[in-house]
Amino acid sequence: MKLLVLRLILIISTIFVLLNLSCMVNGLSLKRKSIVSDHWVNVANSIDGKTLTYNTIANKVDFLQFRVDREDESRILNDMYINVTSVKAARFGIFFNNFNPANSSNDSRGRAGYCPIWFATCGAETPYFSLGSNNSYTSDLTFTVTVRDEIKLCDF
């Protein structure tokens, strides 16, 4: 009987440790809005919650919509950089939440691709960004999303 109780305690404590470890990982994912429907499709993941990369081809008339999701809704992403590189010398406009273009008013560092801290209540804000092409040709694109820091908003 004692052996059975000890095994049960060991199993329960192992499950508890595994659940706590899974909560400590703040996964980061990049989702793209589907062209044919209004659904968001997961295109890239980052287990460490710091960096993810996604490659795609943009046609000359494409308007690409993305959102960055985090697994832990009690944290917000601070110092988030979105870098878009192109094989060709392409020009793209990056727009953040509510289709506001990245400019000096919402980009404290004065360059497109930097998202300042998102002020929000617990889990209420998800960074969205869109990419509009102003070129006449197709281009291969690489998206790199980097988060330097996280801020704990609240305890649930």
UniProtKB/Swiss-Prot annotation:
This protein's UniProt keywords: Glycoprotein, Secreted, Signal
Gene Ontology cellular component terms for the protein in this record: extracellular region
Coiled-coil annotated residue ranges, if any: none
Location(s), subcellular: Secreted
Domain of life: Eukaryota
Glycosylation sites noted in the Swiss-Prot or TrEMBL record: N20, N83, N103, N106, N134
Signal peptide: 1-27
Protein name: Uncharacterized protein DDB_G0281771
Organism: Dictyostelium discoideum
Source organism phylogeny: Eukaryota, Amoebozoa, Evosea, Eumycetozoa, Dictyostelia
